Every structure is written in C-alpha cells, then in structure tokens.
Amino acid sequence: MSRLSPVNQARWARFRHNRRGYWSLWIFLVLFGLSLCSELIANDKPLLVRYDGSWYFPLLKNYSESDFGGPLASQADYQDPWLKQRLENNGWVLWAPIRFGATSINFATNKPFPSPPSRQNWLGTDANGGDVLARILYGTRISVLFGLMLTLCSSVMGVLAGALQGYYGGKVDLWGQRFIEVWSGMPTLFLIILLSSVVQPNFWWLLAITVLFGWMSLVGVVRAEFLRTRNFDYIRAAQALGVSDRSIILRHMLPNAMVATLTFLPFILCSSITTLTSLDFLGFGLPLGSPSLGELLLQGKNNLQAPWLGITAFLSVAILLSLLIFIGEAVRDAFDPNKAV
C-alpha cells in the first residue's frame, strides 16, 4: 500500500470502509477461484492413480483400458465398476470431492431424472441426469469468463470511440453520435435469433455478437469527460508545444476519463453475465448440453415438480449479481472524493 499515491490510498481506504462491498469482493474472488478449479472439485475422472507401482494422471492425459490391464484399447471409463475394482485392488485412487463432471450422467441412481438431492448428488440431478452442483461450478466459470471478456472488449471499444468523439469534436462527434443512435436501435436479440438459424452458436460467436452491439455503454461518459477537459489550459499548452494527439489523449486526458469509467465496470460485468444467462434461458445461447446458469433456470421452469433446480439456479445467479452490485457501489464510493472515511 505504501507504493500507492496519496489519492489512491484514500480511494482504497474508502473502498475498505464500505464493508459490504469489500467483503463482497473477497467472496466473489473465492467463488470465481473455485469455479476456475472446477476440474479439481467436480470430475468423473480420478485426479491421481497409483497402479502396479506406476503413477497415472487421468486429469491431464487420456489412458486406455488396456493401460490398467483391461482387454480393450478404448478410452478408460473410470465409472465402470470393473475398472474401479481393479484400480482399488492393485493400487489407490484420488478422486475429486464431487465425482461428476459438467456432462456426467449418474447412471447408478434408481430414481427418475431429475432426482432430488442425495449423498451422491448433493444438489440433485437435472432433467438429463447431470449433477446440479457440478454444472453450477462449470456454469459459473463460463458466465464470469464471458462477462469479463465482454466487459473488457466493449469497454476498450467504448472508451476509444468516446475519446475520439470528445477530443476532435465537430464532424467526428456529429457523425459518431448519429452512428451510435442508429446502431443502438438495432434489435440485437432478433439478430441473434436470425443468425442462430444459420450458424451454430458457441462461446466465441456469442461474444463477438454481443461485443458488436454492446460497446456503447461507456461512450457517453468518456465523450463528456473529453469534451470537458479538451479546453483546459494544460491541454492547450500541450497542443501549442506540438505534442501529438495520441500522446495528449493517452497520457493527459484518458487518466481523467478512466476515473468515471472504472466506477461503471462492475455494473457492466453484471449486465454481461445477465446477457449470457438470458440468451441461454431463451435457448439462443451456448450449445445444447453446455453447463450454463441460464440453461439450469430453463430446466427449473420446465420441471416445476423438481424445485431444487429452479431454487439452486436462482440463488446462484442472484448471489453472483448481488456481489457484483455491492462491489460496484463500493467502487463508486471509493472514487467519490466527497465521501468521508
């Protein structure tokens, strides 16, 4: 903390003073960290195998059944009772706490899908027999990574467009504003539905489409800040000394605009996660079978006789978005110099 400037130290103190936002940040980081380690927490493959004096790492490498003394050269099925017994008799196996992956199906249960919570499936199974907790972990990772990438890409494009409009003004600003007015009126959802009938949606395809239509949220904030600061004396002096426009924008004007921009980022991230969840809920998101919070919400709606699906999905989304909103409020207070610690 000693390396921070006095201004940033005061901002950090104001952020920590907001206890709700401060602890929400830590809880969010812990949950996101757990989701990044989903393969170590929920997996239908062993993490480590000791067999006949040799070490095997199924999490990192695919082994055939013949590697463990089986008759077939096909990929080993670690849920096969015969292979399980053989591994236990000739060595030992380290399993993940949850023995189901994102696409695993619990064939051992004698209850119809979706089945209620049990010792095997702590939060029950979905309509396809997948473990709900495992799909929540993997779905949270996909949602947050999608949100972070969408927030980063759209923020860069929005800041760049707002900076150019605000700095140059005139026709650049006029035509830029007219273009944004037209572009923001495009029916994004209908375009996604139309394109989904032609192209199979995937993570990168959805990210590109949402970035293409979602970069305008920061343009107005950055543009207003550049319009305000471009007539300041130090900017005029830099222009008179022959400093390049690029240097003036990046070194002298952008840092001031970023103060307002940073306060919006947690809310943009929240909106980005909601976008993917909504598309998955409507059936125009990730491919069928992908772990997704929106897809689990859809299953909860379609299976009202299995309330654990809807309740689990709703709580997961609500907690995630609430944490981000609390963080955003704390960041906003931290950058407000009128807030007392």
Swiss-Prot record:
Role of this protein: Probably part of a binding-protein-dependent transport system. Probably responsible for the translocation of the substrate across the membrane.
Matches recorded under InterPro entries: MetI-like (IPR000515), MetI-like_sf (IPR035906)
Periplasmic-side positions: 43-143, 200-201, 274-307
Family assignment from sequence similarity: Belongs to the binding-protein-dependent transport system permease family. OppBC subfamily.
Gene transcribed to yield this protein: yejE
BP terms from Gene Ontology: microcin transport; oligopeptide transmembrane transport; peptide transport
Membrane-spanning parts: 22-42, 144-164, 179-199, 202-222, 253-273, 308-328
Localization per Swiss-Prot or TrEMBL: Cell inner membrane
Chain ranges of the ABC transmembrane type-1 domain: 140-332
PROSITE patterns in UniProt: ABC_TM1
Protein name: Inner membrane ABC transporter permease protein YejE
Membrane-side (Cytoplasmic) residue stretches: 1-21, 165-178, 223-252, 329-341
GO cellular component, one term: membrane
The entry's keywords: Cell inner membrane, Cell membrane, Membrane, Transmembrane, Transmembrane helix, Transport
Gene3D superfamilies from the UniProt entry: MetI-like (1.10.3720.10)
